[in-house]
Amino acid sequence: MRLRRRRPFAEVIERQLDMFARDHAGLLAECDAALRAYDDAAAEEAEERYGGYVDLIEAVRDDLEGLRDGFASTLDEETAERYEAAFALELRRRYPRYGLDLD
C-alpha cells in the first residue's frame, strides 16, 4: 500500500485562501477591472491607469501578508518558516500576480 504524501499545511492554506477570496472578492474584482482598464487605455492614460492597478495589487499583497503573518505568529520559528514557504508556493500557484514578492 502506497501512502500519498500531502503537502505540509495544504489544508489550512487552502482554507485561508478560500476565505480570503470570499472576504476580499470586491478588492480582487477591482484589481481585475483596473488591469482591464490599463490594457484598454489610450497611451496618454496608460500610466495613470497602471498606477491605480499597482495600488490595488499592493493592497491585496498587504492583506495576504497579514493573513500569512498572523497564522505564522502562532507557530514556533522553524514551523513558521515551513508554513511561510508552503503559503508562498500555494499563493504563486493560485494567485500568481499577488504572490511574487511577499516580504
Predicted regions: what is each one?
Residues 7, 11, 44-47, 51, ...:
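Generic alpha-helical secondary structure signal
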Residues 1-40:
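Short terminal alpha-helical segments
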Residues 72-103:
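Amphipathic alpha-helical binding modules
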Residues 11, 40, 52-55, 85, ...:
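Intrinsically disordered, low-complexity regions enriched in small/polar residues
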Residues 24-68:
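Amphipathic alpha-helical interaction modules
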